[in-house]
Amino acid sequence: MATAVVKALKKKFQDREIIVVSPHSGLWMNNPDVYRIYLMGQTPYFYEDFIKDKDTIVIKSDPYLHQDYINKKVHCIEAWCVQNDVEYNGEEPEIFLTEQEKLEAEGSLINHGKPILLLQTNGGSGEQYSWVRDMPYKTAAELCKKLQEQYKILHVRHESQPSIDGIDWLHSPNIRQVLAAVQYSHARLLIDSFVQHASKAYGKRSTVLWPVDKIGQLGYDLHDNIVSSYEPVKTHMADYYLTEDDIVGQSHMCPFPKDKDIGKISLKIIETIF
């Protein structure tokens, strides 16, 4: 989403060089709107080189704290722009791959003998499960059984995250290799994480599961968005601050009932993929 914000920033500050400090430098590589990229925490002499005694505009903000985002009135991208007094005109995420990156991705995926389906079940980089965002393991495993005959399923995940029996793992320390695989995949079954944003950047319609409905704030109309349906169990919201469900998904506030039926959800997902 940040690439969309930078695109809007460049339209406002056309005579400025944009320097990005990010934990994910690979997302920004070759972006024509960006002058320099620095990895967060690796910024030697940054203040002296770019800020001290210079006419520099510093933009550092958290869109998740914007009033209209909290109140579910605007998408995160728009909130981010408005928060920094930048006009939002529907800018969308962007990724810029070289032709060599595309060729390597295509070559690595072409020999599986089946169309490629990318599966992402967990977000973040840790092993903790978030009921707010992540796909239930039981749902993912059942879907894989039904889809693996037609598709070669590649599971996008970190080493510490749960695997699914019989499903190959797609991971690389170079996030751009994963992003390139997104472009050359045939179908995608995702959650709200970086692959759904990359799919939007490529215009690749995907199926995205939402345990909690945050489509208006974090999703895209391009995708087939499937929201879980359930009768919530009463839980106290004592630990919520500015939102009714933080991304961590604290266990003692999970409203999902026991043995929530996944049959109808699984069928709907399969229908969107086929």
What is the meaning of each model-derived region?
Residues 1-274:
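Catalytic machinery of carbohydrate-active enzymes
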